[in-house]
A protein has these predicted regions:
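N-terminal lobe/hinge region of extracytoplasmic solute-binding protein
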Residues: 61-109, 117, 140
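Surface-exposed binding/hinge segments that line
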Residues: 108, 113, 150-190
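Gly/Pro-rich hinge or "lid" segments in bacterial periplasmic/extracellular proteins
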Residues: 178-232, 238-241, 343-344, 348
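Ligand-site clamp/hinge motif
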Residues: 219-262, 401
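Append "and occasionally in soluble cytosolic enzymes with long acidic Gly/Pro-rich linkers
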Residues: 291-390
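Ligand/substrate-recognition segments at binding pockets and active sites
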Residues: 357-430
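Extracytoplasmic/peripheral linker and loop segments enriched in polar/acidic and small residues
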Residues: 403-412, 437-499, 519
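Long beta-strand-rich cores associated with HINT superfamily self-processing modules
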Residues: 495-519
């Protein structure tokens, strides 16, 4: 081949090699430099988005637009939960229901009087002074409101005396400070039904043409270190859509109290905490068989409370054989009844009570009487219905024959209030001082079937006055139970995964550390 031909072949080969190399480079992964540039551009876009939203991103919380944000008239759960964000109180309660001073500088309980001194220099979010007269005004509003009425039912009045607030109670209560977590509003700022009262909380609410925005309160007493200058409130009108609103990103946080007896799995960061909702087995004290302390003790020992909490309530409850929340600070160091089932001990007690024979139905008999009862339950609550069936099976296993009567809510309420039951499965929300007034007060919501002259009722009243200790009452209650505690229910707080910082929620404040959240 001539030299010129060789040169042409070499040139053709070089052209082909260059083309192939170029094609190969088109399908190659981008270089590290290219990836870094892309990420930097994305971060810049996020940074700009955050800047537009006040420097920290846009946080959205649920509320019900058709409901009020007034802490004394709000009916919906989301709006009630926002109360601790918009309004401070004299005291807040921590995760163990221990009262922590917020607006209060000090507080003391003496007999039927509670004396509270305010911190100095307190101001509302509008810059006006917060005084003792605002506290008295708020107390009177709270005591008449559905949300706070029960927890303040033992308080008869409040007045200003030498700059302090003096509360007068109807009965002695050593744990009264835990009840003083009602919202404090500026006197007269709730003059209209649509008004959002002025508060002193971490945020204030600003109403726009068609929306409500929360603005950080720069005058907050603890120094506002919140990462969000503003928070959007998003209308979530019904409880069925609240989980969906979180999962699609419309809101960043929700709270569910599971009062309907159903749990739906949530795709988010979640935390659960004990609420004050006590599930209990009500007892008709007029039934002669249920007046026998050994029968009642046996029933308590026969209950597998942990199994009920984990199975019937799907883990959203904590077993308790005492009528107080297991994590209540006042119980620390005390001896409390165990929650473990003990069928052998239960059977022994029944035999000691004279029920040493077993009939054809499996029920124990003695002295011509049979341990056979009905158990009323609201069939519309799946958690409670499942618990009732488990309780019936557990009691029947030791010879206490129980037949579950499933009733619609209206019929169930009528039966309980009318005393037409042997046993009933109920639930009551205790106030933060763990008052058992719902059971032992003549106007109590859970007084049905209880002997108000019985040993447990008498011991409880003595405990409040200091005549006997809390430990003494627990011992008396275990020996002579007026009702059988089963468990305390839990609530579920859920937050979108893009929000960072610890998620601290408890029964006193589901937004306990809102100021620490960030994107």
């Amino acid at each position: 081949m001539k030299p010129s031909g060789i040169v042409r072949w070499i040139a053709l080969f070089l052209c082909l090699f260059i083309c192939l190399a170029s094609l190969a480079s088109c399908g190659r992964e981008p270089t590290d430099e290219a990836s870094t540039a892309a990420v930097s551009g994305e971060e810049a876009a996020i940074s700009e988005s955050q800047k537009n939203a006040g420097g920290t991103g846009k946080l959205s919380l649920p509320y019900v637009k058709g409901d009020s944000l007034n802490p004394f008239t709000a009916k919906s759960l989301p709006n009630q939960m926002l109360s601790t964000v918009l309004y401070d109180s004299l005291y807040s309660v921590d995760a163990t229901l221990s009262p922590q001073p917020l607006l209060a500088a000090s507080g003391s309980v003496s007999g039927t009087q509670v004396r509270v001194a305010l911190k100095s220099g307190l101001v509302f979010s509008d810059g006006s002074s917060l005084s003792a007269s605002d506290v008295v005004y708020s107390f009177e509003k709270a005591a008449a409101s559905p949300h706070y009425r029960a927890q303040l039912s033992n308080f008869s009045s409040a007045k200003v005396q030498s700059g302090n607030i003096i509360f007068t109670m109807k009965e002695v209560d050593p744990y009264a400070l835990s009840c003083l977590d009602f919202a404090i509003i500026k006197r007269g700022s709730d003059s209209s039904e649509t008004a959002i009262p002025v508060g002193s909380g971490r945020y204030s609410a600003v109403r726009g043409d068609s929306s409500v925005t929360l603005k950080a309160n720069k005058s907050w007493l603890n120094g506002n270190t919140t990462k969000f200058a503003s928070i959007s409130l998003v209308d979530v009108p019904d409880s069925d859509s609240v989980i969906h609103s979180l999962e699609i990103g419309n809101v960043n946080f929700i709270f569910q109290d599971l009062s309907g007896g159903v749990y739906q799995r949530i795709n988010a960061n979640t935390t659960e905490f004990l609420m004050n909702n006590l599930v209990f087995l009500g007892i008709q004290s007029k039934n002669e068989l249920l007046q026998n302390p050994k029968v009642l003790q046996a029933m308590s020992l026969a209950l597998a409370r942990e199994e009920i909490a984990s199975s019937a309530y799907q883990g959203h409850a904590a077993a308790s054989a005492v009528p107080f929340r297991p994590d209540w600070n006042a119980l620390k160091g005390l001896s409390t009844a165990g929650v473990k089932q003990n069928k052998e001990a239960a059977i022994k007690l029944l035999q000691e009570a004279g029920f040493d024979k077993t009939g054809a139905s499996g029920a124990r008999t003695g002295g011509g009487k049979t341990l056979q009862f009905t158990l009323a339950v609201n069939k519309e609550n799946p958690f409670r219905l499942s618990a009732a069936n488990m309780i019936a099976a557990q009691l029947s296993a030791v010879g206490i024959k129980v037949t579950v009567t499933q009733l619609a809510w209206a019929d169930y309420t009528k039966a309980v209030q009318g005393g037409s039951f042997d046993l009933y499965l109920g639930e009551v929300k205790l106030s933060n001082n763990m008052s058992l007034a719902p059971f032992f007060d003549e106007a109590g919501a859970a007084k049905a079937g209880i002997n108000q002259e019985g040993a447990a009722a008498a011991s409880y009243k003595q405990m409040l006055t200091g005549a006997v200790s809390l430990q003494d009452f627990l011992s008396t209650f275990q020996e002579n139970p007026a009702f059988l505690p089963v468990c305390f229910r839990k609530g579920v707080a859920a937050r979108s995964r893009d929000v960072q910082g610890d998620l601290i929620s408890h029964s006193g404040d589901v937004y306990a550390n809102l100021q620490d959240w960030h994107f």
